[in-house]
């Protein structure tokens, strides 16, 4: 087999492969003989179809199949011998005018780039930290109490307040016409908790049982109901019942209802703190990981294989269509989504993937078995039956691959933070959780 490789531009290469025709024909004959032993054709017993008949019926498809296989095998061998790291699939075409007894093919493809990562000791990375405060524990206790609140009807002359549960009838009209979702009876919502539009809640707040009110309401331009978004409606609301919320006391009964065996408030708070610290750890790691990855991209020089970027764009478009389909959008799998929508993000992903792969290769940052085990056990710790969760991960190669990818990213993050100029920044628990 004769092979030549030519550089076309940047990462693009052209490989010319010359194969002896007899190797192709020999394999075609072998496959046709194998096929003849099992093929079924009218007028012949199984396995008794003459070779010339088999060749006439299947010769072209078998020849095409062998050509593809042989060229693919030859390309893989030649690329390996030339130490070419091929990105994507080659575009293969047969050349005309080949010498007698030979087949000549051109394979045009891209190679992965050499990745040059700048001196990481000069890179700057902001590393955030946060603590679980007593206030954060108090807020979680309040959330747990609200989840277990009960309601009791207020006196008839008691106005609706924030935290009350209101039972109402309402009807909305736009230009005198009712609209979908604009009418309901015995509808319940919690006043002041953002379940309804602010103008609606403001109108109901202060109303009493049996009272009716008409008021205008402006739907936001970005309202999820496109038919009413940006329009003004006139609502008629009648309050049928107002109920006050009663929160359970923070005591032994509450603690036991939340699974605390000894029922002490101290044990409840300790359990909440433990869970919050686990969540804080994951969120800090994710945030600091993003900062590290941004720094890596900013401190690396490389050309991007167009084929890799396009493959990532295609994956993202398919993901977007799948998401639209899950939301019930008709013909979502045919939705026209321009490549340019995802190209910048795809380029960033490909760039980051190549940089991380080089960093892992050059510094031995592959995931170790003990790291995989520890990470899975940490993920499983928050579940009622951790060992079942561990077995769930271990029993699926795809899930294990996802765990391995996370562990490698964690290794890279730790490695970079150990090299770079780190600017430590303490933030509040609420800032970390996005509650401010």
Curated annotation (Swiss-Prot):
GO biological process, alphabetically ordered: 'de novo' cotranslational protein folding; cell division; chaperone-mediated protein folding; protein transport; protein unfolding
Family matches, as NCBIfam families: tig (TIGR00115)
One GO MF term attached to the UniProt entry: peptidyl-prolyl cis-trans isomerase activity
InterPro entries: PPIase_dom_sf (IPR046357), PPIase_FKBP_dom (IPR001179), Trig_fac (IPR005215), Trigger_fac_C (IPR008880), Trigger_fac_C_sf (IPR037041), Trigger_fac_ribosome-bd_bac (IPR008881), Trigger_fac_ribosome-bd_sf (IPR036611), Trigger_fact/SurA_dom_sf (IPR027304)
GO CC terms, sorted: cytoplasm
Domain PPIase FKBP-type: 163-248
Cross-referenced HAMAP family: Trigger_factor_Tig
Domain notes: Consists of 3 domains; the N-terminus binds the ribosome, the middle domain has PPIase activity, while the C-terminus has intrinsic chaperone activity on its own.
EC number(s) on file: 5.2.1.8
Catalytic activity, as annotated: [protein]-peptidylproline (omega=180) = [protein]-peptidylproline (omega=0)
Keywords in alphabetical order: Cell cycle, Cell division, Chaperone, Cytoplasm, Isomerase, Rotamase
Signal peptide range: none
Similarity remark: Belongs to the FKBP-type PPIase family. Tig subfamily.
PROSITE patterns: FKBP_PPIASE
Protein name, per record: Trigger factor
Keyword Cell cycle: yes
Function of the molecule: Involved in protein export. Acts as a chaperone by maintaining the newly synthesized protein in an open conformation. Functions as a peptidyl-prolyl cis-trans isomerase.
